[in-house]
Amino acid sequence: MKIIHTADWHLGKILNGKQLLEDQTYILDMFVEKMKEEEPDIIVIAGDLYDTTYPSKDAIMLLEQAIGKLNLELRIPIIMISGNHDGKERLNYGASWFEHNQLFIRTDFTSINSPIEINGVNFYTLPYATVSEMKHYFEDDTIETHQQGITRCIETIAPAIDEVAVNILISHLTVQGGKTSDSERPLTIGTVESVQKGVFDIFDYVMLGHLHHPFSIEDDKIKYSGSLLQYSFSEAGQAKGYRRVTINDGIINDVFIPLKSLRQLEIISGEYNDVINEKVHVKNKDNYLHFKLKNMSHITDPMMSLKQIYPNTLALTNETFNYNEENNTIEISEKDDMSIIEMFYNHITDKKLSDIQSKKIKNILENELRKED
């Protein structure tokens, strides 16, 4: 049996003001073409199909087109669950009707102990839920953390487990020790959101969404597919794609399959003038770029200048300010006003004040002192 594991499509994502629908359309078209080659028995999408609870019309249309090609044209069964970014009601609309075409959508706990059986493999679904939702569902006020809530869910599933069959869990959560990125919205505020690996011991394999790194956790049977695209600059350089999971005679193996996106996220460090004069290495001018530059404080609008050469510049950081405070502590009380100004100017521009600048500043300081007298 062949299963394709994917998650975290985040359709409708906007990165630093840039709409990513073109990139998402490109990668989904590639994903569909790959599925024609793979001919899987089922596709699992482990949450966060959309980036927001109320996705745009274009994002909804993009999902419908992709799912239509995969499920209706290629006739591949699909199981999808909701993630913390998805609007459950919107994603679940028409779910009972879609099941006639083997498109299984799960957004709540009503079916957590009723597996979806495909080719003798039992797929248990555990969509994302807040601690409050789990507390309400189980009518148990003692549930205060995700660990407690997920443990309660697994205890509910346990009696239904067929130990003779292969049992797979699909969920959207953070496993303790998993690598995170900036684009992952925290699941909770003020409480620990991670879940210990041991809670999943009753399953033969676990397919997860939420963490965007495809190798977020090192485990033989607990796997994240990672996101289809790089969605924050903390993910720059990360491989993106999907997992191919095969089951032969009860033995489960998986391999990560990378996909090449239309554009990459790239971080460029250096001197402002070198970048403007195109003396730094940029993999692709069309990439989404974050520049971390020195010596640009004298430039009125450096971002505009950068965008004229690199149109997809999305972020700009003045590296001058990124210094080690412990090694650059200045006892201000021991410095006179002129010395402080000279040090500040040198720190910002890496230059010394000219004689003319020094003279003007001294005159200003002397005038201020006379006013005080």
From Swiss-Prot:
Keywords: DNA recombination, DNA replication, Endonuclease, Exonuclease, Hydrolase, Nuclease. SUPFAM superfamilies: Metallo-dependent phosphatases. Coiled coil: none annotated. InterPro entries: Calcineurin-like_PHP_ApaH, DNA_Repair-Maintenance_Comp, Metallo-depent_PP-like, Mre11_N, SbcCD_nuclease, SbcD, SbcD_C. GO terms for molecular function: 3'-5' exonuclease activity; endonuclease activity. It comes from the Bacteria. SbcCD cleaves DNA hairpin structures. These structures can inhibit DNA replication and are intermediates in certain DNA recombination reactions. The complex acts as a 3'->5' double strand exonuclease that can open hairpins. It also has a 5' single-strand endonuclease activity. This is Nuclease SbcCD subunit D. It comes from Staphylococcus aureus (strain bovine RF122 / ET3-1). The lineage of its organism: Bacteria, Bacillati, Bacillota, Bacilli, Bacillales. The gene is sbcD.
